[in-house]
Amino acid sequence: MKQTEVVPTITPLIPESTSPILQDVDEDQKYISLFPVYTLRAACGYFGNMEPVSMLGWMRVPWNTKKDRTKFIVQAVGHSMEPRIHDGDYCLFETYKGGSREGKIVLAEHQGEVDSDYEGAYSIKVYHSKKVFDEDGYWQHESITLQPLNRNYDPISIDTEDADSFRIVGEFIDTIEVE
């Protein structure tokens, strides 16, 4: 049987004194070379804890972009996305705007049975879905699978009954190297 990671609530993996998360930043650099970092921990295993999500601060990326408020940063926890994403990596995502997700690394949220004060649970995985079409040409998901890259971990299957409590939050862009 493969491993299923249960990720406890943890403190940041980088000590606060050397944290790459900035508080006081120039307004003109926001969303160009600095992007917001959120407190959610995206499990590289099964869905993470039901933690409230808030902004921690800003993190510098090693490149500039056009001003883009759709990008954000979260910290990965766990080993299921190795070798691409490691435990503690800061990951840059772009807010999901629609379109095909097939084969892409995504940040997924699964609300399930959670307290309404919390945002839900998050996981980083490769997205796969099978669709079925009816006689009118409309499709629906037959199955959704979130696949880890590390073969020591099982994929996560989303039941069609749970599809309403599941959504893609963002598409993975890259990890950010912390100095």
Named regions from a protein language model:
Residues 16-17, 32, 57-61:
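Signature of the catalytic double-stranded beta-helix
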Residues 25-29, 63-66:
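Short secondary-structure boundary/capping segments within folded domains
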Residues 1-23:
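Helix-turn-helix-like N-terminal two-helix hairpins of bacterial/phage DNA-binding regulators
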Residues 64-179:
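Acidic/glycine-rich C-terminal interaction modules and beta/coil loop segments
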Residues 39-75:
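Short beta-strand/loop turn elements enriched in aromatics
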Residues 21, 59-61, 92-93:
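Glycine-rich, charged/polar anion/phosphate-binding loops
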Residues 30-35, 72:
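Short structural boundary motif marking the start of a folded domain
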